[in-house]
From Swiss-Prot:
Function in brief: Master enzyme that delivers sulfur to a number of partners involved in Fe-S cluster assembly, tRNA modification or cofactor biosynthesis. Catalyzes the removal of elemental sulfur atoms from cysteine to produce alanine. Functions as a sulfur delivery protein for Fe-S cluster synthesis onto IscU, an Fe-S scaffold assembly protein, as well as other S acceptor proteins.
Cofactor: pyridoxal 5'-phosphate
Organism of this sequence: Pseudomonas putida (strain ATCC 47054 / DSM 6125 / CFBP 8728 / NCIMB 11950 / KT2440)
The protein, known as: Cysteine desulfurase IscS
Gene: iscS
Residue list for modification N6-(pyridoxal phosphate)lysine: 206
Lineage: Bacteria, Pseudomonadati, Pseudomonadota, Gammaproteobacteria, Pseudomonadales
UniProt binding sites for [2Fe-2S] cluster: 328
Amino acid sequence: MKLPIYLDYSATTPVDPRVAQKMADCLLVDGNFGNPASRSHVFGWKAEEAVENGRRQVAELINADPREIVWTSGATESDNLALKGVAHFYQTKGKHIITSKIEHKAVLDTARQLEREGFEVTYLEPGEDGIVTPAMVEAVLRDDTILVSLMHVNNEVGSINDIAAIGELTRSRGVLFHVDAAQSAGKVEIDLQKLKVDLMSFSAHKVYGPKGIGALYVSRKPRVRLEAIIHGGGHERGMRSGTLPTHQIVGMGEAFAIAKQEMVAENARIKALSDRFFKQVSNLEELYVNGSQTARVPHNLNLSFNYVEGESLLMSLKDIAVSSGSACTSASLEPSYVLRALGRNDELAHSSIRFSFGRFTTEEEVDYAAQKVCEAVNKLRELSPLWDMYKDGVDISKIEWAAH
């Protein structure tokens, strides 16, 4: 076993060696390096063929038409294109958008920007299991609502929204539905022939593909119109200009093709690893699982260790790569906005760690990590006066702290 151990697969995944090989074949002078938009010679034709093959591979994982896949630089850009593209195109129809308080910052910050432009956004409060229900959405739908944007799987707590039921609701009301599927692609089955979803964001680097490439599914039936946010040579049917990076696209396509073949077996293996880890740490007192106990992906285990400061715990686990909150916001010492929205108090939100398991995680690594977590939590609690008070039966929430 090699140290340090990587248990932060929800932040990013390493590129699968099979993917890296396919990408390398598109870089050098002997490889497929041409510009896919070059129509006048074989180098361009071969590159375009590789791009279209990648488009087909992405479409096959989610059962969509390849023509519904638009290449972007990642899920952040896909989210921006979906929200701004819909808002700007359909603003004469209405200016109301619905999302939730626990979305990724790529959706929340885009929604804030649209508010500055005069759109009205309703931010739903999920249940404490991290799930937004169809009833919650229905309660705030209005005649001028043009878009509902919700994630499929939450990046911090791994809970799964029932996007099938929410899609039925939005479609029946004539409201567009955007789903951020960055954390669900390759983990949860997605069938866009059945789901009533109009737009869906994807990222390659959460699925063992390269960083810097993603896609946006844009439905053709019913047809969804978008106003572009990046202008130029009119690539991607005018929705997203810019020379297509053949090697990145080939990488994303191969990563999604592997996910399609191996998802079922991989999910079972990762569930076994996650259960094995949880079983070993579950003897710790005052341990809380964040998010849904049932509707969740096995890859993500977000735990709060009461009376332990999360940052201290992270520092104590120096050979184990885990995170508190999402990678995009984990540099701040603020407690996770997601856990706060789920109703966790500051103390529990501050004591949370996200463990995420993946394709290259081994049983040996899981056992080592569980042992180190137990040792660190017990040691930090020994040093904590709050833990002593809790063990003595003092209700800490009732204490009036006096300022010196």
